[in-house]
Amino acid sequence: MSTQMTMRLTWQKRLKRILFSILIKRLFLEGGKSRVTRLSAEFVFRMHAKYPSAELFHSREKLWNTFGKHLSQQQWIGFEFGVASGDATKTFLKMPYAEKCLGWHGFDTFMGLPSEWGDLPKGAFSTDGVPPQIKSDLLKWHIGRIEDTCTTINSLSNLDKNFIVIFDFDLYTATKAAWDVVVNHLKSGDIIYFDEAYEADEDQIINEIIESRQVNLEVIGYTTMGIAFQIKS
């Protein structure tokens, strides 16, 4: 590809981001009726200021699709903290790089939120304690409170492989409990994704991780709600 064409594509991508940012900014400044819209707008501008070279994706699925190239064809295992109806699980197991997946571990009570969160009531996302019916030999459900189930991670096999870790518990306490265990096994090349980074709970966790310097994080990209990082040595 010629230098001129590369520059043109780079500029087009930049222009697309700028136009999208202007739209979100307008919604934010005009005080959109939706609380989520306002928080999402604020999140986009905060991330753009903090990570100016990071790519903004218009959907989490498009962001997830890029994980394959970051894994560089390596074998990996997945950890999903907060499963609910299993939409994310299904999506990841259909990704092109899923052929390198050695196992997918989903952690949830399947009883919904244990307390109110944002605009949602206690019990939101409940499936009455029943995990989603997904046919895959890769799946292993860990049902119960994360404080009780997360230590099973320490005895799992293939912990030397790369990780894809999805944090979608929404609440600070549960996310922190999961992080405190999984961080002991993180290594260079692992990918971590926060699905509700625009909300205060996950934002607090992310800031604490960065400030603690337990791991060296490099941004892969973000959406209007979530953000993905890769662990670097």
Task: Describe every region a protein language model picked out.
Residues M1-A54:
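Membrane-proximal basic amphipathic "stem/tether" segments
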Residues F43-Y51, N65, K69-S233:
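S-adenosylmethionine/decaboxylated-SAM
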Residues R60-L63:
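Extended, alpha-helix-rich binding/interface surfaces that flank or overlap catalytic cores
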